[in-house]
UniProtKB/Swiss-Prot annotation:
Name of this protein: Bifunctional protein FolD
Superkingdom: Bacteria
Pathway note: One-carbon metabolism; tetrahydrofolate interconversion
The gene coding this protein: folD
Taxon lineage: Bacteria, Bacillati, Bacillota, Bacilli, Lactobacillales
Record GO terms (molecular function): methenyltetrahydrofolate cyclohydrolase activity; methylenetetrahydrofolate dehydrogenase (NADP+) activity
GO BP of this protein: L-histidine biosynthetic process; methionine biosynthetic process; purine nucleotide biosynthetic process; tetrahydrofolate interconversion
Length: 284
Protein backbone atom coordinates (compact mmCIF):
# COMPACT_ATOMS: atom_id res chain seq x y z
CA UNK A 1 0.00 0.00 0.00
CA UNK A 2 1.30 3.44 -0.91
CA UNK A 3 2.64 5.68 1.86
CA UNK A 4 1.59 9.33 1.74
CA UNK A 5 4.42 11.80 2.35
CA UNK A 6 2.64 14.33 4.56
CA UNK A 7 4.36 17.64 3.91
CA UNK A 8 1.82 19.56 5.93
CA UNK A 9 2.49 17.55 9.10
CA UNK A 10 6.27 17.76 8.64
CA UNK A 11 6.05 21.51 8.03
CA UNK A 12 4.02 21.98 11.22
CA UNK A 13 6.59 20.00 13.21
CA UNK A 14 9.51 21.97 11.77
CA UNK A 15 7.79 25.33 12.24
CA UNK A 16 7.03 24.51 15.89
CA UNK A 17 10.71 23.69 16.45
CA UNK A 18 11.70 26.84 14.58
CA UNK A 19 9.45 28.98 16.80
CA UNK A 20 11.35 27.70 19.85
CA UNK A 21 14.69 28.55 18.23
CA UNK A 22 13.42 32.03 17.38
CA UNK A 23 12.31 32.51 20.98
CA UNK A 24 15.75 31.47 22.24
CA UNK A 25 17.51 33.79 19.78
CA UNK A 26 15.40 36.69 20.95
CA UNK A 27 15.99 35.89 24.64
CA UNK A 28 19.75 35.33 24.31
CA UNK A 29 20.76 37.84 21.64
CA UNK A 30 17.83 40.25 21.39
CA UNK A 31 17.48 39.39 17.70
CA UNK A 32 14.18 38.65 15.94
CA UNK A 33 14.51 37.20 12.42
CA UNK A 34 13.03 39.68 9.97
CA UNK A 35 11.45 38.79 6.63
CA UNK A 36 10.07 41.20 4.06
CA UNK A 37 7.97 40.01 1.13
CA UNK A 38 7.45 42.38 -1.79
CA UNK A 39 4.39 41.77 -3.97
CA UNK A 40 3.98 43.66 -7.23
CA UNK A 41 0.51 43.66 -8.80
CA UNK A 42 -2.63 41.72 -7.91
CA UNK A 43 -1.99 38.21 -9.25
CA UNK A 44 -4.52 36.09 -7.27
CA UNK A 45 -2.19 33.10 -6.81
CA UNK A 46 0.64 35.36 -5.66
CA UNK A 47 -1.65 37.03 -3.15
CA UNK A 48 -2.52 33.64 -1.64
CA UNK A 49 1.15 32.62 -1.46
CA UNK A 50 2.11 35.89 0.21
CA UNK A 51 -0.66 35.63 2.80
CA UNK A 52 0.42 32.09 3.64
CA UNK A 53 4.04 33.17 4.05
CA UNK A 54 3.07 36.10 6.23
CA UNK A 55 0.85 33.93 8.44
CA UNK A 56 3.57 31.30 8.91
CA UNK A 57 6.24 33.91 9.67
CA UNK A 58 4.15 35.59 12.35
CA UNK A 59 3.21 32.24 13.91
CA UNK A 60 6.90 31.35 14.20
CA UNK A 61 7.67 34.64 15.96
CA UNK A 62 9.33 36.42 13.06
CA UNK A 63 9.21 40.10 12.28
CA UNK A 64 7.17 40.00 9.07
CA UNK A 65 6.61 42.82 6.61
CA UNK A 66 4.64 42.69 3.38
CA UNK A 67 4.97 45.48 0.83
CA UNK A 68 2.27 45.58 -1.82
CA UNK A 69 3.03 47.65 -4.91
CA UNK A 70 0.97 48.55 -7.94
CA UNK A 71 1.82 46.68 -11.14
CA UNK A 72 2.61 50.09 -12.63
CA UNK A 73 5.66 50.52 -10.38
CA UNK A 74 8.83 51.02 -12.41
CA UNK A 75 11.87 48.78 -12.14
CA UNK A 76 14.05 51.55 -10.71
CA UNK A 77 11.59 52.18 -7.86
CA UNK A 78 11.52 48.49 -7.01
CA UNK A 79 15.31 48.27 -6.97
CA UNK A 80 15.49 51.36 -4.76
CA UNK A 81 13.08 49.73 -2.29
CA UNK A 82 15.14 46.53 -2.26
CA UNK A 83 18.28 48.55 -1.55
CA UNK A 84 16.59 50.10 1.48
CA UNK A 85 15.93 46.64 2.88
CA UNK A 86 19.46 45.53 2.00
CA UNK A 87 20.68 48.24 4.41
CA UNK A 88 18.09 47.47 7.12
CA UNK A 89 19.76 45.43 9.88
CA UNK A 90 16.38 44.28 11.26
CA UNK A 91 15.60 42.49 7.98
CA UNK A 92 17.44 39.22 7.36
CA UNK A 93 15.44 37.88 4.43
CA UNK A 94 14.12 39.62 1.31
CA UNK A 95 11.71 37.88 -1.05
CA UNK A 96 10.27 39.42 -4.20
CA UNK A 97 7.24 37.36 -5.19
CA UNK A 98 7.40 36.07 -8.76
CA UNK A 99 6.14 36.42 -11.43
CA UNK A 100 6.69 40.13 -11.94
CA UNK A 101 4.94 42.34 -14.53
CA UNK A 102 6.42 42.12 -18.02
CA UNK A 103 8.06 45.56 -17.86
CA UNK A 104 10.24 44.49 -14.92
CA UNK A 105 13.27 42.27 -15.57
CA UNK A 106 13.35 39.36 -13.10
CA UNK A 107 17.12 38.93 -13.35
CA UNK A 108 17.80 42.58 -12.53
CA UNK A 109 15.58 42.38 -9.46
CA UNK A 110 17.23 39.18 -8.21
CA UNK A 111 20.66 40.75 -8.70
CA UNK A 112 19.60 43.75 -6.62
CA UNK A 113 18.99 41.62 -3.52
CA UNK A 114 21.89 41.25 -1.08
CA UNK A 115 22.98 37.59 -1.48
CA UNK A 116 23.10 37.26 2.31
CA UNK A 117 19.38 38.14 2.42
CA UNK A 118 18.36 36.20 -0.70
CA UNK A 119 16.24 33.62 1.12
CA UNK A 120 14.77 32.38 -2.17
CA UNK A 121 18.27 31.29 -3.22
CA UNK A 122 18.03 32.76 -6.71
CA UNK A 123 20.99 35.19 -6.68
CA UNK A 124 23.86 34.03 -8.96
CA UNK A 125 26.24 34.05 -6.00
CA UNK A 126 24.01 31.59 -4.15
CA UNK A 127 23.47 29.38 -7.19
CA UNK A 128 27.26 29.36 -7.60
CA UNK A 129 27.66 28.08 -4.04
CA UNK A 130 25.08 25.39 -4.80
CA UNK A 131 26.77 24.20 -8.01
CA UNK A 132 30.16 24.08 -6.27
CA UNK A 133 28.82 21.81 -3.54
CA UNK A 134 28.84 24.47 -0.82
CA UNK A 135 25.16 25.45 -0.62
CA UNK A 136 24.22 28.47 1.45
CA UNK A 137 20.83 29.83 0.40
CA UNK A 138 19.03 27.14 -1.62
CA UNK A 139 15.76 27.55 -3.57
CA UNK A 140 13.07 26.71 -1.04
CA UNK A 141 11.11 24.04 -2.90
CA UNK A 142 14.10 21.75 -3.59
CA UNK A 143 15.34 22.37 -0.04
CA UNK A 144 11.93 21.33 1.29
CA UNK A 145 11.93 18.16 -0.80
CA UNK A 146 15.34 17.21 0.60
CA UNK A 147 13.95 17.61 4.11
CA UNK A 148 11.10 15.26 3.19
CA UNK A 149 13.60 12.67 1.98
CA UNK A 150 15.51 12.95 5.26
CA UNK A 151 12.45 12.78 7.47
CA UNK A 152 10.99 9.76 5.69
CA UNK A 153 14.33 7.94 5.47
CA UNK A 154 14.32 7.83 1.67
CA UNK A 155 17.70 6.58 0.44
CA UNK A 156 19.19 8.64 -2.40
CA UNK A 157 22.67 7.24 -2.94
CA UNK A 158 22.88 5.13 -6.07
CA UNK A 159 19.21 5.67 -6.93
CA UNK A 160 17.95 6.71 -10.37
CA UNK A 161 16.25 10.08 -9.97
CA UNK A 162 14.29 11.63 -12.84
CA UNK A 163 13.20 15.27 -12.69
CA UNK A 164 10.50 16.45 -15.09
CA UNK A 165 10.99 20.20 -15.58
CA UNK A 166 14.25 22.18 -15.76
CA UNK A 167 13.35 25.52 -14.18
CA UNK A 168 15.86 27.54 -12.17
CA UNK A 169 13.39 27.45 -9.27
CA UNK A 170 12.95 23.67 -8.97
CA UNK A 171 14.44 21.41 -11.64
CA UNK A 172 18.04 22.58 -11.91
CA UNK A 173 18.74 23.12 -8.19
CA UNK A 174 16.94 19.86 -7.38
CA UNK A 175 19.28 18.03 -9.75
CA UNK A 176 22.34 19.45 -8.02
CA UNK A 177 21.10 18.60 -4.53
CA UNK A 178 20.44 15.01 -5.61
CA UNK A 179 23.86 14.76 -7.25
CA UNK A 180 25.41 15.92 -3.99
CA UNK A 181 23.75 12.88 -2.35
CA UNK A 182 25.19 10.55 -5.03
CA UNK A 183 21.96 9.90 -6.89
CA UNK A 184 22.12 9.33 -10.65
CA UNK A 185 20.08 12.21 -12.05
CA UNK A 186 18.23 12.67 -15.35
CA UNK A 187 16.82 16.16 -15.94
CA UNK A 188 14.05 16.16 -18.55
CA UNK A 189 12.16 18.96 -20.29
CA UNK A 190 9.67 19.78 -23.04
CA UNK A 191 12.05 18.59 -25.79
CA UNK A 192 12.86 15.27 -24.14
CA UNK A 193 12.03 12.30 -26.35
CA UNK A 194 10.42 9.13 -24.98
CA UNK A 195 9.68 10.87 -21.70
CA UNK A 196 7.43 8.12 -20.35
CA UNK A 197 10.11 5.48 -20.92
CA UNK A 198 12.70 7.61 -19.12
CA UNK A 199 10.36 8.24 -16.20
CA UNK A 200 9.66 4.52 -15.86
CA UNK A 201 13.34 4.00 -15.01
CA UNK A 202 13.07 6.32 -12.00
CA UNK A 203 13.37 5.11 -8.44
CA UNK A 204 12.58 8.70 -7.50
CA UNK A 205 10.37 10.80 -9.81
CA UNK A 206 10.06 14.55 -9.20
CA UNK A 207 7.56 16.45 -11.34
CA UNK A 208 7.45 20.25 -11.71
CA UNK A 209 5.96 21.30 -15.05
CA UNK A 210 2.68 23.06 -14.23
CA UNK A 211 0.41 20.76 -16.24
CA UNK A 212 -2.41 19.21 -14.29
CA UNK A 213 -2.40 15.39 -14.10
CA UNK A 214 0.24 15.15 -16.85
CA UNK A 215 1.99 12.20 -15.22
CA UNK A 216 -0.17 9.08 -15.36
CA UNK A 217 0.61 5.52 -14.28
CA UNK A 218 2.18 4.97 -17.72
CA UNK A 219 5.12 7.12 -16.54
CA UNK A 220 5.74 5.34 -13.24
CA UNK A 221 7.39 2.06 -12.36
CA UNK A 222 6.14 -0.03 -9.47
CA UNK A 223 7.67 1.00 -6.15
CA UNK A 224 8.83 4.46 -7.23
CA UNK A 225 8.84 7.46 -4.89
CA UNK A 226 6.82 10.23 -6.58
CA UNK A 227 7.18 13.90 -5.61
CA UNK A 228 4.54 16.21 -7.12
CA UNK A 229 5.53 19.89 -7.13
CA UNK A 230 2.69 21.01 -9.43
CA UNK A 231 -0.09 23.35 -8.36
CA UNK A 232 -2.86 23.71 -10.93
CA UNK A 233 -6.61 24.30 -11.02
CA UNK A 234 -8.96 21.90 -12.76
CA UNK A 235 -12.16 22.96 -14.56
CA UNK A 236 -13.99 23.05 -11.23
CA UNK A 237 -11.36 25.23 -9.60
CA UNK A 238 -10.01 22.37 -7.49
CA UNK A 239 -6.28 22.38 -6.70
CA UNK A 240 -4.50 19.48 -8.40
CA UNK A 241 -0.91 18.46 -9.02
CA UNK A 242 1.05 17.49 -12.11
CA UNK A 243 0.57 13.83 -11.16
CA UNK A 244 -2.68 11.88 -11.55
CA UNK A 245 -2.66 11.01 -7.87
CA UNK A 246 -5.26 8.23 -7.72
CA UNK A 247 -3.90 6.06 -10.51
CA UNK A 248 -0.21 6.69 -9.77
CA UNK A 249 -0.81 5.76 -6.12
CA UNK A 250 -1.59 2.24 -7.33
CA UNK A 251 2.06 1.83 -8.39
CA UNK A 252 4.12 4.19 -6.23
CA UNK A 253 5.59 3.15 -2.89
CA UNK A 254 5.46 6.75 -1.61
CA UNK A 255 3.81 9.89 -3.00
CA UNK A 256 3.17 13.51 -2.06
CA UNK A 257 -0.41 14.80 -2.25
CA UNK A 258 -1.57 18.14 -3.66
CA UNK A 259 -2.42 20.06 -1.59
CA UNK A 260 -0.58 19.15 1.60
CA UNK A 261 2.65 17.86 0.11
CA UNK A 262 5.49 20.01 -1.16
CA UNK A 263 3.79 23.42 -0.77
CA UNK A 264 3.92 23.69 3.04
CA UNK A 265 7.58 22.65 3.02
CA UNK A 266 8.47 25.46 0.63
CA UNK A 267 7.23 28.03 3.14
CA UNK A 268 8.96 26.22 5.99
CA UNK A 269 12.33 26.37 4.24
CA UNK A 270 11.82 30.07 3.53
CA UNK A 271 11.48 30.63 7.27
CA UNK A 272 14.39 28.32 8.10
CA UNK A 273 16.70 30.17 5.71
CA UNK A 274 15.62 33.52 7.14
CA UNK A 275 16.43 32.22 10.63
CA UNK A 276 19.83 30.98 9.46
CA UNK A 277 20.52 34.37 7.86
CA UNK A 278 19.75 36.02 11.22
CA UNK A 279 22.14 33.62 12.97
CA UNK A 280 24.92 34.47 10.52
CA UNK A 281 24.28 38.15 11.14
CA UNK A 282 24.71 37.61 14.89
CA UNK A 283 28.01 35.79 14.38
CA UNK A 284 29.54 38.53 12.21
Amino acid sequence: MVQIIDGKALAQKMQAALAKKVESLKAEKGIVPGLVVILVGDNPASQVYVRNKERAALAAGFKSETVRLSDSVCQEELIELIEQYNQDDTIHGILVQLPLPHHINDKSIILAIDPKKDVDGFHPMNTGHLWSGRPNMVPCTPAGIMEMFRDYGIELEGKNAVIVGRSNIVGKPMAQLLLDKNATVTLTHSRTRQLAAICRRADILIVAIGQGHFITKDFVKEGAVVIDVGMNRDVNGRLIGDVAFDEVSELASMITPVPGGVGPMTITMLLEQTYQAALRRVSQ
